[in-house]
Structure formats: structure tokens, C-alpha cells
């Protein structure tokens, strides 16, 4: 049994689901906050210093994968447990490459959620039993080799790209990221140049393929 009440941050854009997680987790842990997008997750993690973040992948403004990577860059000790509907093996491997300690499918029942939380907080890794560990480990190694290709875009460019793929206009993106529309346009130009994209449609396809947004 854990000797103290670890601090947990919940990140999920479905309010009812997030509140359900809060009520469940509060029976054993201290839930320090609930946020609904990746930007809020990064900001809250830096402010609240949780021991663990329970995070979904598909979130607006900034997806869970990129948010997790940003948090791990400044808080390497924080534990990340992805809780998502997506059972795509490549996505599971990518989550672990970005710093996850656990990956749990939302198809689990409420009682099953507590075991992976405890395991990850103890320093162990956890994966939903229905996922193939050998295949995930293979893809993790493969994804590590492809890391340089993934880094064609800067952190800021990935943020701009996700918002573009979500259908946001330049002014909206500028307001969200606190930059001028001219700076947004410059980032878009550099993104298209780096990816060899010639249209917004190609940018959206790239964002979907790289799990920044849902299809």
C-alpha cells in the first residue's frame, strides 16, 4: 500500500468522463486538477507539480502525445498514464516513446483503472492486457530510429499545425498561442516547407497520420 496520497492531474476533453475519473481516483489519491486540453495540461503540470498525469490522446488545441512530451521535457520524473479509446499498436508504441509509463484502454471497467495507476506510481509500466507487448516493444525500437524524421517540426510548429488541422483561422491560432497573425503565417510557411506540403489538405493528412488530430 502506498504510504502517502500521490498527486494526480487528469487531462480529458470529455467533462463527464474526466469528473468520473476524479471521483474514482479521489478514493485513494489526491486529484490536484482536471483539464480539458493539452495546453492546459502543460500549464497545470508546471504549476501543480503532480506525481502522475492521467491523459487522453485525442484532445483539442494540443494533443496528449505532444503535451506529454512537453511535460516530460521539464518534469522528467512525472508519471504518465494514457487512458484512451485508441488501441492502434503504433500509437501505443509512440505513447511509450513520448514518455508514457502506462497505456490503458477506456473499455476497462472502473475498478480496473486503479491497478494500473498504482503500478505506474510504484515505478512499473502497465499495458492493457488486450495489447500485444512484443509488437509494441518492436515498434518502440522502430519509432526511436525514426525520431529524427519526427523532429522536422519544432514544438511550436506542431502546435500551429494541430490548430490549423482543427480548422482554426490565423487570428484564432494567434490568440490561443499568444502570437501575431503574421508570426502564425510564417510558422505555416515553414511547416509546409519542412513537410513538402502544397496545400492545407496535405497538412491535415499529415496531422491525422501523426495522431495530432482524429480523422
Where are these regions (language model features)?
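Two-component/phosphorelay signaling modules centered on CheY-like receiver
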Residues: 15-33
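Acidic catalytic/metal-coordinating carboxylates
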Residues: 37-40, 63-66
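Recognition helix of helix-turn-helix DNA-binding domains
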Residues: 169-202
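Helix-turn-helix DNA-binding segment
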Residues: 147-182
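Short, flexible helix-to-coil linker/hinge segments that flank and couple to helix-turn-helix
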Residues: 90-97, 101-159, 212-214
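Active-site residues of response regulator receiver
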Residues: 56, 84
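Active-site beta3 strand of CheY-like receiver
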Residues: 48-54
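Receiver (REC) domain active-site loop signature in two-component systems and cognate sites
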Residues: 59
Amino acid at each position: 500500500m502506498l504510504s502517502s496520497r500521490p498527486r494526480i492531474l487528469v487531462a480529458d476533453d470529455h467533462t463527464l468522463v474526466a469528473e468520473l475519473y476524479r471521483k474514482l481516483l479521489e478514493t485513494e489519491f489526491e486529484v490536484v486538477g482536471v483539464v480539458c486540453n493539452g495546453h492546459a495540461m502543460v500549464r497545470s503540470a508546471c504549476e501543480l507539480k503532480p506525481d502522475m498525469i492521467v491523459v487522453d490522446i485525442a484532445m483539442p488545441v494540443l494533443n496528449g502525445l505532444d503535451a506529454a512530451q512537453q511535460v516530460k521535457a521539464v518534469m522528467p520524473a512525472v508519471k504518465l498514464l494514457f487512458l484512451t479509446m485508441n488501441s492502434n499498436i503504433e500509437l501505443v508504441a509512440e505513447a511509450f516513446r513520448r514518455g508514457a509509463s502506462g497505456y490503458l484502454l477506456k473499455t476497462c471497467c472502473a475498478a480496473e483503472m486503479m491497478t494500473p495507476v498504482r503500478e505506474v506510481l510504484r515505478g512499473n509500466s502497465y499495458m492493457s492486457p488486450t495489447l500485444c507487448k512484443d509488437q509494441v516493444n518492436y515498434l518502440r525500437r522502430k519509432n526511436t530510429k525514426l525520431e529524427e524524421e519526427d523532429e522536422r517540426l519544432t514544438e511550436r510548429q506542431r502546435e500551429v499545425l494541430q490548430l490549423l488541422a482543427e480548422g482554426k483561422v490565423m487570428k484564432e491560432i494567434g490568440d490561443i498561442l499568444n502570437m501575431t497573425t503574421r508570426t502564425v503565417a510564417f510558422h505555416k510557411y515553414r511547416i509546409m516547407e519542412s513537410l513538402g506540403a502544397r496545400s492545407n489538405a496535405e497538412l491535415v493528412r499529415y496531422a491525422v497520420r501523426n495522431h495530432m488530430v482524429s480523422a
